[in-house]
A protein has these predicted regions:
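Flavin (FAD/FMN)-binding glycine-rich loop and adjacent Rossmann-like elements that form
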Residues: 1-262
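N-terminal propeptides
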Residues: 262-282
Length: 282
């Protein structure tokens, strides 16, 4: 997004410390224990497992969870550093330092407290670069809001159709338009993924990996079509983009002849999630 900021066009930044986007991450891997065995122990001893996680997070100072990898003996730990603005040097530096500061102490605690699982646990590696969930965003030709979820808004320039983790519409698919990737007042530049134009609430449901992949793919196709046809991104043939995505790249899009109709039928059968209390009261 640095290029978009240098154009002189508008951008917006983080909302609040409570937002998911205000949590950075410095992920790491721990080896020497069986993730399957860990899961079985968790299930058999829920109270002890909850206490172990709580104390581990207290020692490291960061909320973290272990996830499986392709190797049962190596687990990946995701984490959430709250109230961090990764668009600032201070926010990035705090994550880099705090993410490593007490990590080995935490692993020693696991080894001593639960040797049945962690007796041989060791730190495999730490990510060489911090992870961000959000920073600056476009002020775009269209701004995604929770209205897109609560009212199932349809867009003629839809380029991605994704289920999200938003409970307002029971995680039903929402349409993301090309306009949400276009910087207001600036030609021939787009910013998909975590920098798309969305307000401070909606962005938390739109900046996960699936949406980053989907909007990134669409932005690439849009740029290729614009170059091939000699147009700007704003004047690009949206139908051609949609047909390439749905017809050649197997990307489901609503109201497109290349998309399996059963996807739409399923969404309609479930009312696009608009049966929730929040949607009915909107």
């Amino acid at each position: 997004l640095d290029l978009c900021r240098q154009t002189g066009g508008e951008t917006s930044s983080l909302a609040s410390s409570n937002a998911r986007s205000s949590h950075t991450a410095l992920v790491y891997r721990v080896g020497g224990f069986s993730f399957q065995k860990y899961c079985e122990w968790n299930e058999a001893h829920p109270a002890a497992a909850a206490s172990l996680k709580e104390n581990y997070n207290r020692i490291t100072g960061i909320r973290a969870l272990f996830f499986p990898t392709t190797d049962d003996q190596i687990s990946w730990a995701n984490n959430w550093h709250g109230n961090r603005d990764c668009s600032t040097i201070a926010g990035c530096t705090q994550t880099e330092i705090e993410g490593r500061l007490h990590l080995r102490e935490g692993i020693e605690y696991l080894k001593k407290t639960c040797p049945y699982v962690f007796s041989d646990a060791y730190l495999v590696d730490v990510a060489p670069q911090l992870g961000v969930r959000g920073s600056h965003r476009l002020v775009g030709d269209y701004t995604m809001t929770y209205d897109d979820f609560l009212f199932h808004k349809k867009h003629d320039d839809v380029i991605a159709w994704h289920s999200t983790m938003c409970a307002l519409n029971d995680r039903a698919p929402v349409e993301i338009p090309l306009r949400a990737l276009m910087q207001k007042g600036i030609n021939n530049i787009s910013a998909p993924g975590r920098h798309m134009a969305a307000d401070k609430m909606a962005i938390d449901s739109l900046n996960l990996i699936p949406q980053c992949v989907g909007t990134g793919q669409a932005a690439g196709v849009a740029a290729a079509v614009a170059i091939a046809d000699g147009t700007t991104l704003r004047d690009v043939d949206i139908r051609k983009i949609q047909d390439i995505l749905a017809g050649e790249q197997d990307v489901p899009l609503p109201r497109n002849v290349h998309t399996d109709i059963s996807y739409t039928e399923c969404a309609e059968e479930h009312e696009y999630g608009l049966y929730t209390v929040e949607a009915r009261n909107a």
